[in-house]
């Protein structure tokens, strides 16, 4: 059985650091390559978590970890940042594994902070000569601009597909062909996703490892005093670099593993066992609390799942709960969270299956399931009651939360409520949230981008007739729609769950059962479900109504 994995955030100085934690037993640290994040090490995490408490940190500027403040980053800077992270979590001396850029960071960490490291397993230490770096990477860091025409998706797909064909990917010569088969489409999709997440911040750290670290790597290897295992698969482009290492000290060795990734994982486990370290892993140190700025955390809920939560403001103030629209997540509410947090403690969870929150384990969850999950979240946070604002598909959850847990909801406001007629409901269920399957040519990225973009033009988005035009102002900026696309793509297998749940929910009856008098936000382009504003106003003729924004109904 694979041990359960948890996601966490940790405050390290002024930065938020995201990490994965899995397993029980002595602690061990894993460091990913670039331009990836800790999820790339999922197979290693699953393997090692049967024996260790594994901590896999997103390095600065990758995944969900904030970047270092300087533009000219060195591997030493990254190693020092990791040492600060280990200190912040009170990590005892333990074994460390790193791959490629992660191997460079692990090596530098062990040299600069040996008291923190019982030993290192280094998978592919980059030791390029300056001449090789100048030749191989002249065009390696080519920018892929985000455009309002969506051209970035074909460009990124081709770039990471090419990475599976040539090294470097930008030099398409016979002698640069990789000695293995083209990677599966799922692998290309994963790399494209990781790249886009880090696209604005990855380059300084990646350049530090590929362009400038080669000579320093050999110096660090010569200075290393802790036990070490150097390795790489035979097909790794960095395999030849092991021959460049200086003479090794006692307790340090080079190990060949052929082309077997299973052999690599077994070698890591054997190395960790030999290195030893502390017997007990540290507890997670960060919690929900006061924040002047927007902060994020993962909260454990039922069935081993987690809710990704954005929060801001001071605990003890009146609490406001924001429930987002779909498709998407609370990412769309960050500006509203910050605005409301000046006078309230604001919670904005990604609803289950959306954004970075775990999906329900059961098939076809209901709106009641979502409402109960949010009530459970509030209990776990120690929040007694909230002013709730539900937007679009999230409004259905807000209504059901007020009905099923009336003591929790002191105020309720709604912006766009799904109120289709029966035939319209079936029509929407058939077309509104199509599956997002990975395509070999990467076209699923553009198709998803186009779906979201079209939702700003037509209601519903797939009815592209003149009569269906929304005639509402919308944000068509390249950055906005691209961020939205990444958000939905991150939960592509479950993004539709909330939509189907709302389509199976009778909001008319639910509104009639309300014991708390809602306020309505009518008009504007906040949600496509504003198409039902006339029906909503007719159902609730005597309630307070405002235009956007909703602050007047909540505070």
Identify the residue ranges that each predicted region occupies:
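N-terminal cap/lid segment of alpha/beta-hydrolase-fold proteins
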Residues: 1-16, 281-306
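Conserved HGGG/HGGXW glycine-rich cap/lid loop of the alpha/beta-hydrolase fold
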Residues: 11-67, 85, 92, 305, ...
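Active-site loop/oxyanion-hole signature of alpha/beta-hydrolase fold enzymes
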Residues: 55-101, 348-393, 555
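Hydrolases whose catalytic domains are alpha/beta-hydrolase-1, hotdog thioesterase
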Residues: 105-109, 397-401
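Flexible "cap/lid" loop of the alpha/beta hydrolase fold
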Residues: 111, 119-153, 403, 410-445
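Conserved serine/cysteine hydrolase catalytic core
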Residues: 185, 190-244, 256, 473-535
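Catalytic active-site module of serine/aspartate enzymes centered on a nucleophile-bearing elbow/loop
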Residues: 246-297, 541-555
């Amino acid at each position: 059985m694979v041990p359960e994995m948890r996601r966490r955030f940790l405050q390290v100085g002024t930065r938020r650091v995201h990490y994965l934690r899995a397993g029980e037993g002595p602690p061990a640290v894993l460091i990913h390559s670039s331009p990836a994040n800790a999820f790339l090490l999922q197979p290693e995490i699953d393997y090692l978590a049967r024996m260790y408490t594994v901590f896999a940190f997103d390095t600065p500027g990758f995944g969900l970890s904030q970047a270092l403040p300087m533009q000219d980053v060195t591997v030493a800077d990254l190693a020092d940042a990791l040492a600060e992270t280990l200190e912040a979590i009170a990590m005892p001396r333990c074994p460390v594994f790193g791959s490629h850029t992660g191997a460079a960071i692990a090596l530098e960490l062990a040299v600069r902070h040996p008291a923190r490291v019982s030993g290192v397993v280094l998978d592919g230490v980059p030791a390029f000569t300056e001449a090789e770096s100048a030749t191989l990477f002249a065009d390696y860091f080519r920018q892929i601009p985000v455009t309002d025409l969506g051209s970035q998706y074909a460009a990124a797909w081709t770039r990471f597909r090419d990475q599976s064909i040539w090294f470097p990917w930008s030099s398409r010569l016979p002698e640069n062909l990789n000695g293995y088969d083209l990677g599966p489409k799922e692998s290309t999709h994963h790399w494209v996703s990781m790249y886009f997440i880090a696209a604005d911040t990855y380059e300084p750290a990646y350049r530090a490892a590929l362009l400038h670290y080669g000579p320093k790597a050999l110096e660090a290897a010569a200075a290393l005093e802790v036990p070490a295992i150097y390795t790489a698969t035979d097909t790794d482009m960095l395999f030849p670099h092991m021959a460049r290492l200086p003479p090794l000290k006692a307790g340090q060795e080079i190990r060949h593993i052929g082309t077997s990734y299973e052999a690599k994982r077994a070698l890591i486990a054997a190395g960790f066992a030999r290195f030893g370290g502390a017997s007990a892993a540290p507890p997670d140190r960060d919690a929900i609390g006061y924040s002047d700025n927007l902060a994020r955390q993962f909260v454990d809920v039922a069935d081993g799942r987690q809710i990704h939560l954005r929060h801001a403001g001071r605990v003890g103030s009146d609490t406001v709960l924001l429930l987002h629209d779909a498709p998407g997540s609370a990412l769309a509410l960050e500006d509203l969270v910050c605005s409301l947090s000046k006078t309230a403690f604001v919670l904005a969870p990604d609803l289950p299956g959306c954004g970075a929150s775990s999906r329900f384990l059961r098939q076809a969850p209901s709106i009641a399931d979502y409402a109960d999950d949010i009530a459970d979240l509030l209990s776990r946070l120690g929040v007694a009651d909230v002013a709730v604002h539900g937007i679009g598909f999230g409004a259905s959850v807000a209504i059901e939360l007020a009905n099923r847990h009336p003591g929790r909801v002191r105020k309720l406001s709604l912006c766009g409520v799904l109120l289709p007629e029966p035939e319209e409901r079936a029509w929407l269920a058939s077309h509104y949230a199509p599956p997002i399957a990975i395509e070999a040519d990467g076209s699923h990225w553009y198709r998803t981008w186009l779906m979201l973009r079209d939702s700003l033009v037509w209601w519903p988005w797939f009815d592209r007739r003149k009569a269906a035009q929304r005639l509402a102002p919308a944000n068509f900026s390249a950055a906005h729609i691209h961020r939205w696309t990444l958000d939905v793509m991150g939960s592509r297998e479950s993004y539709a769950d909330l939509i189907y749940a709302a389509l199976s929910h009778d909001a008319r009856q639910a509104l009639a059962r309300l014991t708390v008098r809602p306020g309505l936000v009518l008009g504007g382009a906040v949600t496509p479900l504003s198409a039902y504003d006339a029906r909503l106003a007719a159902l609730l003729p005597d309630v307070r109504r405002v235009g956007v924004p909703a602050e007047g109904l909540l505070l």
